[in-house]
From Swiss-Prot:
Toxin complex is secreted when grown at 25 degrees Celsius or less; at higher temperatures the proteins are present intracellularly but not secreted. It comes from the Bacteria. This is Toxin subunit YenB. InterPro entries: Integrin_alpha_N, Sal_SpvB, TcdB_toxin_mid/C, TcdB_toxin_mid/N. One of its GO terms (cellular component) is extracellular region. Residues 389-698 form a 5-bladed beta-propeller domain which closes one end of the shell; the other end of the shell is closed by the RHS repeat-associated core domain in YenC2. The keyword Secreted applies. Residues 27-378 are annotated as: SpvB-like domain. The keyword Cell membrane does not apply. It is found in: Secreted. Disruption phenotype: Cells with a disrupted yenA1-yenA2-chi2-yenB-yenC1-yenC2 locus are no longer pathogenic in C.zealandica larvae. Residues 389-698 are annotated as: 5-bladed beta-propeller domain.
Length: 1487
C-alpha cells in the first residue's frame, strides 16, 4: 500500500520551437439542454503573476445586440435590479439578480434572523460613514459565494455598492464609483446595475475595471435631440492588473486609486478612439477624435430609464510596462502594445454583426505580423430573394362567412387555425407534421370542436391574462367575469372568476398593454397628459393609478383622428410595448418607461404615404426581418410595401412585394403575419374573398435572421451551424406520441431556435465532420416566466452528410440524455423512455429533499417531504441537471438498440431559508451516480456507483462511498456472440468478480469564514477504508444513500474493513492550525505503512531496529485520521515542502524540497514577483533566466554548468531561433553568441531554404499560417480590372480582402452573393495558388564554426483541422518523383509516376486517409519528390498499400485489415477484451 504525492519542483527552461500551426484558441461549446449555440475567443492578455481577468469574447445564439454586435458579449460580473416582473420602482420592493442571473433574497444568520449589521470598516479600512450591510442569497445556490449589499445608513451620505466574496478567497466590489454603475442620469440614486469594479486576491493582487459612460461624441444633431439623456450606458474600457505594490484591501477604499504607473499590465477596449489600420500601432492613451458611433444605435427601457447603446468595440489591446518589468527607469514610461485583437463588423442600420477577428502583433521596427482572420457570417434577411406568393390549400375550406384566425391555441409554438362554424360553435385545427413532405413540412389536423368553451358572448376574448405563456378565454359579460385556461393537453380548465374587473374595462378607449413591464396585459386608458393604469396581478387587476406625464410629453389618444393609427408595438426593439402613432407622413413612438410613464416622443423617419390615400386600416405591424423591432407593412391594392425598421431609429426604403396576378387588396381582404412554417419566423397570410375565397401565403424568410451560422478560420476549416425551431421538434414529438395512442402535451408555448446540426469542413482534405442534436420535452415555467430547458437531448456524432477522404462507412454513436426541467409534469414521465432491456437493472433514482439543520457543530442534511409550494422551488433547483445518459452505436446491427453504457444520477436539493418565507433558497448536488458498462451485452454488465453520504454546509463532501457491484451469477447459456473462442466465456469468471467491494472515503476541510475572510473547501485530511462482502450481501434493489446510513449499513462502525490509507495537508503555521487566507501549503502527509504492510519485516528485523530505520529514512508515526476506537498509528511520509515569502513578496514560494532529507531548491524572483529568474539547488548549482516581458517567457538561460541557451521569439511569442554556447571539456564550445554573430531569421521559406551552412543557430523556424489565403495587391487589381482605386476600396470595405491584401473566405462569399465576380477577377484569383498552412524548421547538426555543418530542412503542412497533413524532409540527391504545377505527380506515357535524378530531393510522408469522423483509416508509405511543396494528388502511385483501420461507433479500433488482406480484430465486452491476430482470423478468410 503506497499513495505517494510528489511535489513538482520548479525548474527553469526555455520554450520549445516548431510544431503545428495553431489558431487563436477559439472553441465551440458543447450542445446542452438549452439548445443554444455558444462560442468563445480568448482575449489577448497575458497571465501576469497568474491573476488575470477571467474574460473572453463569447457568442450565444440566445443573446441580443451589444457593444460587440449581435449575439456577442464580453462582460464582467454584475448585479442588477430584476425587470422580469416589472420595471423597477427603485425602492425596497425591488428584487436583485445575482451575477448568475438568479433572484436574491436576504439571507438568515445562524440565529434565524435577517443577516443585517451596521459597519463602518471594510477589510480593516475605516469608511467615511456607517453602512447597513445586508447579506443576500440567490434562490439557486451554485458555489456558495457570499454577497453583501452595503447601503449608507443615511441616504445622503453616499451611494450603495455590493461586495462579493468568492469561495476561492477573492473579494470583488461592484459599483463603488459612478463609472461602474448604470444609473439614471437625472437621479443617480436610481441604480439599475452595479458593475464589477475591482477584485483583490488573498495574496494582495488586484484587478481594476474602468468603464466609460455613453456620451454624444460623434453623434448627429438629430440623434442628440432625440436622445438627450444618454449617459446611463457603461462600456468596459480598460482593465488594469499586476499591481506593483501588494495590498490586502481594495484600492477603492483608499482616498485615491493607484495611478496608472502602479500597474504592470493593461487590457484596453477600443471603441474607435484609435486608428484601426494594422499598419499603425495603437497608442495607450488613444486618439483625439473620440469613439465612433455605430449605425444601429439602440436603446433599452426595461429599467425605466433610457440606456442608449451607440458604440462598437473595434479592437482589444494588450499593453505591458516593459521598462518597469525589466527593472529599468520608469520615468514617463508609456505602456507598450504586446498583442492586438482587431474586430471587424458588417455595419448595418438594422443590425451590425461581428464578421472577423484577427490577431496582430508587431516587430521591434513597427512592422505588423498577422494571423489569418477568424471570420463569421450569419443567417440574413435577404430583401432581394423574397419568394413570391403561393396558394395555401390548407385554408381553402374557409370563406368570408367563417371567421378564422391563425392562432396558437394550445401553446405549441406554432399556430393552428381557430374558426367559427356557426354562432357559438368554435373549432380548432392544430398543427401537425405533414406526412410525405420534407422534414419541416407543416399541415393541420382534423377539426376539433371546442365544446367546453362557454358560448361566445359579448366581451369574450382570447388573451394570456395570467402571464403563463398560454391563452385564456376571458369572459367579461354582465354577471359572468372570469376565464378558462387551456391545459397543455388542450383541455380547458374550470372557470376562474375575476374578482376585481375594473369598471372601465368596457370603456371604448380602454386598451390592454403591458405597461408595468411584467409580461402581463394591464388595462390602460390614455389621455394627452395622463394615463390611468390598472396593473394586471396575474388574473386580477390592481386599483387604478393615475400617472401624470412629464411636461414635454403629450400622448396620442386612440380614436381621436381617423387618419392615424395609435397602437402599442415594439418599435424600438427593447422587448416592450411602446405607444406608437402612425400617420401618412410620420411615425412617432413614445417609449414605455414602465408603470404608465412614457418618454418624450421619438420620430422614426422613412415612412410616408400620400395624404389623400393613406388608410390606417392598411397598416400592419410585424417583425419581418427578425431584428426584434416591428416593421411596417402598408397594403396597396396591387402590392405590399414593407418598411424595415432600422433598430428603432428610422425605416428603410420600402420593399415592394407584388400581389398575385389578378389580386387587388381592398378592405374585404384579410392580411396577417404568422409562423405557419413552424420555423419561428413570420410568413404573410392573405385571404381574398372575391370572386371566390382564395388564401395565399408568402414566406419572407426560410431561416431566422441574425444567427451565427458560419465560421471560417482561413486556415482551411469551416464550421457551419444549422438551427431548427423548437416547434419543429415538438411536431416530431407530437407525431410519435399520437402514433403511440397517447395524448400529446406541450410545455413550451413559443418557438426557440435551437442548435440542430453542425458541420466542420476541411477545405484542404475534403473531410467533413458532422454532429446532430434532437430535442424533446421543452419546458417553460409560466409562474417565474423562465425557460427551463429540454428534458431529452439526443446527440449523434456523424450522419449521412459526413464525408471522409475515403469511402469507408462510419457509424454514428448516439447519446440519449435526460435532464431535469424542474417541472414534475415532465420530469416524472421521463423514466418511461429509459432503456428497459436489462430486467435486473436497479430502479431509477428519485430526488432527495433536505433541510439544513444545525443539530451539531458541523450541521447536517435532514430529509423531509416538502409541501406543494416548497416543492415548486426545490424542483426548480434541479433544472438542467443530467438525470440519465445512454450511449448507443447506430451501426444497423441487431445490437444497435443495446447501449454500450448507461449512467444515471440522483440529485439532492437542500432547502435554505431566507427572509422571504414563501421562497426558499436551494442548493442542488449530485449525491449518487450509477454506471453500467454493457458493451451491448445486456445480461452481464459491470456496475459501479458513487454515493455522497454527507456534505458540509458549504457543499464539500465529508463522507462518500465508491461501490463496485459483483458480477452477476453465471448463466447457463452464454449471452456473448457465438464467434468468441471456445471456453473464453467460462474462463472469464473469477471469484474476485463475485465479491462486493465498497470504498469509504472520509474528508475534512478548512473553511475560513471569519470577519472579511471567505475561503471555502481547503483540503485538510482524508482517509479511505475498504469493505468486501460476498455477492449475496448486495441489496436486491441496489445501494442508496438511505441504505448506507441505516443501522445495518455495510459500512457501519461494527463492520470489518481494511484500512486503505490517509493523507493530510499542512499549511504554513502547522498541521492543526487554521491556515491563513493565502492557504500556503507547507507540505503534504501521506500514509505509507500500516501494521499489515509491516508484517513483511517480521523475521527480518526486530521492531526496534525497524522503527529506527524508518525514522532515519524520514518516516514518522502518526495517528490514524477519523480513528476508530484504538486503531494503531501508521507510518507517514511528509513530502512537498515549500517556504513562502511574506506580504511584500506576494506570498510567492521561495524554496521547495521533496522531503526534509533532501536539500532545498531556492527560488529567486524578479523585482515585481512575476517570474522566477534564478533557482539554486542543494548543491549550490545555479540556473538563471532572462525574460522577454512581452510574453513573460524566458529567452536566455544559464544552466548549472554555466552554459548559455538562447531563443528568439517572434511578436506572437513563438520560438523562431535557438542556439547555445558554453564549454566542453574546459574549452569554449557551441554556437557563436548573438553579439558575435547575429542571425536574422529569413522572412520567407524560400529565403530560408537558400541558406548556406555556417549559420549560428541550432534551430530556426519560419511559419506561414496565412498561406491558405490568396493574396491580392492593389496593383494587381488596378492592372487587371482597370481600377482607379474605387474597386479596391470597395473590396476593403466589404472585407473581401484584408488591409494587407489577403482574400477572406466569407468576405469573398458575401461579395459574390451581393455583387458577383467578373471573369477578369475570377481569372486573377484562379492564378493565385493556395497552399495549406505550413512551417519550416532548419536544424543544424554541428556548430557554425565547423565547416562540415549541415542543415536539416523539414517542412510540416497542416490541414484545416490542425492535423499533420504532410511532412517533407530534405535528403541527399537521387531519384525521385516529380511534382507538377497543379500539385499532382508527373506521369510518363504508361501513366505511372515519372522518375528524375535531382539534387532537390525530399522525403515526403505518405497521405493519411480519414473516415467521416476524422479518424485515421490508412497511412501510406513515404516517397521521394523533387519539390517540398504540398502534393494534393498522388493517385498515380502504384505502391498505394496500407493497413486499413476500422472503428466502432465509439471510435475504438476493432479491426485492422492489413495491406495483404489479413485481419486483426479486437472485441470489447463488459468484463474482458478479445484480441485476435492474423493467425486467429486466418480460418475465416475467403480462399
Amino acid at each position: 500500500m503506497q499513495n505517494s504525492q510528489e511535489m513538482a519542483i520548479t525548474t527553469l527552461s526555455l520554450p520549445k520551437g516548431g510544431g503545428a500551426i495553431n489558431g487563436m484558441g477559439e472553441s465551440v461549446g458543447q450542445a446542452g439542454p438549452d439548445g443554444m449555440v455558444t462560442f468563445s475567443i480568448p482575449l489577448p492578455f497575458s497571465a501576469g503573476r497568474g491573476v488575470a481577468p477571467a474574460l473572453s469574447l463569447s457568442y450565444s445564439s440566445g443573446a441580443g445586440n451589444g457593444p460587440f454586435g449581435m449575439g456577442w458579449q464580453c462582460s464582467a460580473m454584475s448585479i442588477s435590479r430584476r425587470t422580469q416582473k416589472g420595471v423597477p420602482q427603485y425602492n425596497e420592493d425591488d428584487e436583485f439578480l445575482s451575477p448568475s442571473g438568479e433572484v436574491m433574497a436576504i439571507a438568515l444568520n445562524d440565529s434565524g434572523f435577517e443577516d443585517v449589521r451596521t459597519a463602518n470598516r471594510l477589510q480593516g479600512i475605516p469608511l467615511p460613514f456607517s453602512y447597513k450591510v445586508t447579506r443576500y442569497q440567490p434562490r439557486l445556490i451554485q458555489d456558495f459565494i457570499k454577497i453583501e449589499y452595503w447601503q449608507p445608513v443615511k441616504q445622503t451620505d453616499g451611494t450603495p455598492f455590493w461586495i462579493i466574496y468568492s469561495p476561492d478567497g477573492q473579494t470583488h466590489i461592484l459599483g463603488k464609483n459612478s463609472h461602474s454603475r448604470v444609473a439614471n442620469a437625472e437621479n443617480p440614486s436610481q441604480i439599475a446595475s452595479w458593475l464589477l469594479e475591482e477584485t483583490v486576491t488573498p495574496t494582495g493582487e488586484h484587478i481594476y475595471y474602468q468603464y466609460s459612460g455613453e456620451n454624444q461624441v460623434n453623434c448627429t444633431d438629430a440623434e442628440i435631440a432625440l436622445h438627450p439623456q444618454d449617459s446611463a450606458q457603461r462600456y468596459l474600457a480598460r482593465i488594469d492588473y499586476g499591481n506593483i505594490s501588494p495590498q490586502a484591501s481594495l484600492f477603492v477604499l483608499d482616498e485615491e486609486l493607484p495611478n496608472l504607473t502602479q500597474w504592470l499590465f493593461h487590457l484596453v477596449f477600443d471603441y474607435g478612439e484609435r486608428d484601426i489600420s494594422i499598419n499603425k500601432i495603437p497608442t495607450f492613451e488613444g486618439g483625439t477624435t473620440g469613439w465612433l458611433a455605430r449605425p444601429d444605435m439602440f436603446s433599452r427601457y426595461d429599467f425605466g430609464i433610457e440606456i442608449r447603446n451607440r458604440r462598437l468595440c473595434h479592437q482589444v489591446l494588450g499593453f505591458h510596462r516593459l521598462e518597469a518589468l525589466n527593472d529599468r527607469d520608469v520615468t514617463d514610461e508609456i505602456p507598450v502594445l504586446v498583442n492586438r485583437l482587431t474586430l471587424d463588423y458588417d455595419l448595418n442600420n438594422s443590425v451590425s454583426t461581428l464578421v472577423a477577428v484577427r490577431q496582430v502583433a508587431y516587430e521591434t521596427d513597427g512592422s505588423p505580423i498577422t494571423q489569418p482572420p477568424l471570420e463569421f457570417d450569419y443567417q440574413r434577411f435577404d430583401t432581394g430573394s423574397i419568394p413570391g406568393w403561393q396558394e395555401m390549400p390548407q385554408l381553402e375550406a374557409f370563406n368570408g362567412y367563417q371567421p378564422y384566425q391563425m392562432i396558437d391555441l394550445y401553446g405549441e409554438g406554432t399556430p393552428g387555425i381557430l374558426y367559427q362554424e356557426t354562432p357559438g360553435a368554435w373549432w380548432y385545427k392544430s398543427p401537425q407534421r405533414q406526412i410525405g413532405g420534407d422534414s419541416n413540412a407543416v399541415t393541420y389536423g382534423a377539426m376539433k370542436a371546442l365544446p367546453k368553451i362557454p358560448r361566445l358572448q359579448e366581451g369574450a376574448t382570447l388573451m394570456d391574462i395570467n402571464g403563463d405563456g398560454r391563452l385564456d378565454w376571458v369572459i367579461t359579460s354582465a354577471g359572468v367575469r372570469g376565464f378558462h385556461s387551456i391545459h397543455s393537453t388542450g383541455e380547458w380548465t374550470h372557470f376562474t372568476p375575476l374578482n376585481t374587473l375594473p369598471t372601465e374595462y368596457f370603456h371604448p378607449k380602454a386598451q390592454l398593454a403591458d405597461l408595468v413591464g411584467a409580461g402581463l396585459s394591464d388595462l390602460v386608458l390614455i389621455g394627452p397628459k395622463s394615463v390611468r393604469l390598472y396593473a394586471n396581478q396575474q388574473g386580477n387587476w390592481a386599483p387604478a393609478q393615475d400617472v401624470t406625464q412629464a411636461e414635454n410629453v403629450s400622448l396620442p389618444v386612440i380614436g381621436i383622428d381617423s387618419r392615424q393609427l395609435v397602437a402599442f408595438a415594439d418599435m424600438l426593439g427593447s422587448g416592450q410595448q411602446h405607444l406608437v402613432e402612425i400617420t401618412a407622413d410620420s411615425v412617432k413612438c413614445w417609449p414605455n418607461m414602465g408603470h404608465g410613464r412614457f418618454g418624450q416622443p421619438l420620430t422614426l423617419e422613412g415612412f410616408s404615404q400620400p395624404q389623400t390615400s393613406f388608410n390606417p386600416d392598411r397598416v400592419f405591424l410585424a417583425d419581418i426581418d427578425g431584428s426584434g423591432t416591428n416593421d411596417i407593412i402598408y397594403a396597396h391594392s396591387e402590392c405590399l410595401e414593407i418598411y424595415l425598421n432600422e433598430s428603432g431609429n428610422r425605416f428603410s426604403k420600402p420593399i415592394s412585394l407584388l400581389l398575385p396576378d389578378g389580386v387587388n387588396f381592398d378592405n374585404t381582404c384579410q392580411l396577417q403575419a404568422a409562423d405557419i412554417q413552424g420555423l419561428g419566423i413570420a410568413s404573410l397570410v392573405m385571404t381574398v374573398p372575391h370572386m371566390s375565397p382564395t388564401h395565399w401565403r408568402c414566406d419572407l424568410a426560410l431561416n431566422k435572421p441574425w444567427l451565427l451560422n458560419v465560421m471560417n478560420n482561413n486556415r482551411g476549416a469551416e464550421t457551419c451551424l444549422f438551427y431548427r425551431s423548437s416547434a419543429q421538434f415538438w411536431l416530431d414529438e407530437k407525431q410519435l406520441v399520437e402514433a403511440a395512442g397517447q395524448q400529446p402535451e406541450c410545455h413550451l408555448p413559443f418557438p426557440m431556435h435551437l442548435h440542430w446540426r453542425s458541420e466542420i469542413f476541411d477545405e484542404i482534405t475534403g473531410n467533413r465532420l458532422t454532429q446532430e442534436q434532437e430535442y424533446a420535452h421543452g419546458s417553460w415555467d409560466g409562474q417565474e416566466r423562465e425557460f427551463r430547458g429540454f428534458g431529452r437531448l439526443i446527440q449523434r456524432d456523424t450522419d449521412g452528410f459526413a464525408q471522409g477522404t475515403v469511402d469507408i462507412p462510419t457509424h454514428p454513436s448516439r447519446t440519449v440524455s435526460w435532464f431535469a426541467t424542474g417541472i414534475p409534469e415532465i420530469d416524472t414521465t421521463l423514466s418511461a423512455e429509459f432503456w428497459r432491456g436489462d430486467d435486473q437493472a436497479f430502479s431509477p433514482f428519485s430526488p432527495r429533499f433536505t433541510r439544513w439543520e444545525n443539530d451539531s457543530e458541523a450541521g447536517s442534511d435532514v430529509a423531509f417531504i416538502p409541501s406543494e409550494h416548497d416543492a415548486f422551488w426545490l424542483n426548480r433547483a434541479m433544472k438542467g441537471q443530467l438525470l440519465r445518459s445512454e450511449l448507443y452505436g447506430d451501426d444497423g446491427t441487431p445490437e444497435a438498440e443495446i447501449p454500450y453504457s448507461v449512467t444515471e444520477m440522483r440529485h439532492q436539493v437542500r432547502a435554505l431559508p431566507t427572509t422571504d418565507a414563501t421562497v426558499p433558497s436551494a442548493w442542488c448536488s449530485t449525491i449518487e451516480t450509477r454506471s453500467y458498462q454493457y458493451q451491448r451485452v445486456a445480461a452481464d454488465p459491470q456496475c459501479s456507483q458513487q454515493v455522497v453520504i454527507k456534505a458540509d454546509r458549504y457543499g464539500s463532501p465529508l463522507l462518500s462511498v465508491a461501490i463496485n457491484y459483483p458480477r452477476r451469477k453465471k448463466p447457463e447459456k452464454s449471452p456473448y456472440p457465438d464467434d468468441l473462442p471456445e471456453t473464453l466465456f467460462d474462463s472469464s469468471y473469477d471469484t474476485q468478480q463475485q465479491q462486493l467491494h465498497l470504498t469509504k472515503q472520509q474528508q475534512n476541510y478548512f473553511h475560513l469564514t471569519n470577519d472579511d475572510n471567505w475561503l471555502l473547501g481547503l483540503p485538510k485530511e482524508q482517509r479511505n477504508d475498504g469493505y468486501q462482502y460476498d455477492q449475496e450481501r448486495a441489496p436486491a434493489n441496489g445501494f442508496t444513500l438511505e441504505t448506507l446510513i441505516a443501522s445495518n449499513s455495510l459500512i457501519g462502525s461494527n463492520q470489518p474493513f481494511t484500512y486503505l490509507g490517509q493523507s493530510r495537508v499542512a499549511y504554513q503555521g502547522g498541521v492543526d492550525e487554521q491556515p491563513s487566507l493565502q492557504a500556503l501549503v507547507a507540505y503534504g502527509e501521506t500514509a505509507i505503512l500500516d501494521e499489515k504492510t509491516l508484517q513483511a519485516f517480521v523475521g527480518v528485523l526486530d521492531s526496534k531496529t525497524r522503527d529506527e530505520l524508518l525514522f532515519s529514512a524520514g518516516y514518522q508515526l502518526a495517528p490514524r485520521l477519523f480513528r476508530v476506537e484504538s486503531e494503531p498509528d501508521v507510518w507517514v511520509a511528509r513530502q512537498g515542502y515549500s517556504e513562502f515569502g511574506d506580504y511584500s513578496q506576494f506570498w510567492r514560494p521561495l524554496s521547495q524540497r521533496s522531503t526534509l532529507l533532501t536539500g532545498k531548491t531556492t527560488l529567486k524572483w524578479d523585482k515585481h514577483y512575476c517570474v522566477v529568474i534564478e533557482t539554486q539547488d542543494a548543491a549550490q548549482l545555479v540556473t538563471q533566466a532572462r525574460y522577454d516581458y512581452r510574453f513573460l517567457t524566458p529567452y536566455s538561460l544559464t544552466d548549472a554548468n554555466d552554459n548559455q541557451h538562447y531563443v528568439v521569439l517572434n511578436p506572437f511569442g513563438e520560438v523562431i531561433a535557438s542556439r547555445f554556447w558554453g564549454t566542453e571539456a574546459g574549452k569554449d564550445a557551441g554556437y557563436s553568441t548573438p553579439q558575435a554573430k547575429p542571425f536574422v531569421v529569413p522572412a520567407t521559406i524560400e529565403a530560408a531554404l537558400a541558406l548556406s551552412p555556417g549559420i549560428p543557430v541550432a534551430h530556426c523556424a519560419i511559419f506561414e499560417p496565412e498561406s491558405w489565403m490568396q493574396k491580392l495587391t492593389q496593383h494587381d487589381v488596378s492592372e487587371r480590372m482597370a481600377d482607379n482605386g474605387t474597386l479596391w476600396n470597395a473590396l476593403l470595405q466589404a472585407r473581401f480582402v484584408t488591409e494587407d491584401g489577403y482574400v477572406c473566405a466569407l468576405g469573398r462569399r458575401r461579395w459574390m452573393a451581393r455583387h458577383g465576380l467578373s471573369v477578369l477577377m475570377l481569372t486573377l484569383l484562379a492564378e493565385i495558388p493556395r497552399t495549406p498552412p505550413h512551417s519550416l524548421t532548419i536544424t543544424t547538426d554541428r556548430y557554425d564554426s565547423d565547416d562540415q555543418q549541415q542543415l536539416r530542412q523539414r517542412i510540416l503542412f497542416s490541414d484545416g483541422f490542425g492535423r499533420l497533413l504532410q511532412s517533407a524532409q530534405r535528403v541527399e540527391a537521387g531519384e525521385s518523383w516529380q511534382r507538377s504545377e497543379d500539385s499532382s505527380l508527373v506521369v510518363n506515357v504508361s501513366g505511372t509516376p515519372a522518375l528524375v535524378v535531382t539534387d532537390n530531393r525530399w522525403a515526403v510522408s505518405g497521405r493519411t486517409e480519414y473516415d467521416g469522423k476524422g479518424q485515421g483509416i490508412r497511412v501510406y508509405q513515404p516517397y521521394f519528390l523533387d519539390d517540398w511543396r504540398y502534393l494534393s494528388d498522388d493517385s498515380a502511385r502504384t505502391d498505394l498499400f496500407a493497413d486499413t483501420h476500422i472503428y466502432d461507433p465509439l471510435g475504438r479500433e476493432y479491426q485492422v485489415i492489413t495491406a495483404k488482406g489479413y485481419r486483426r480484430e479486437r472485441q470489447y465486452t463488459p468484463w474482458f477484451v478479445v484480441n485476435q491476430d492474423e493467425n486467429d482470423t486466418a480460418a475465416n478468410l475467403a480462399i
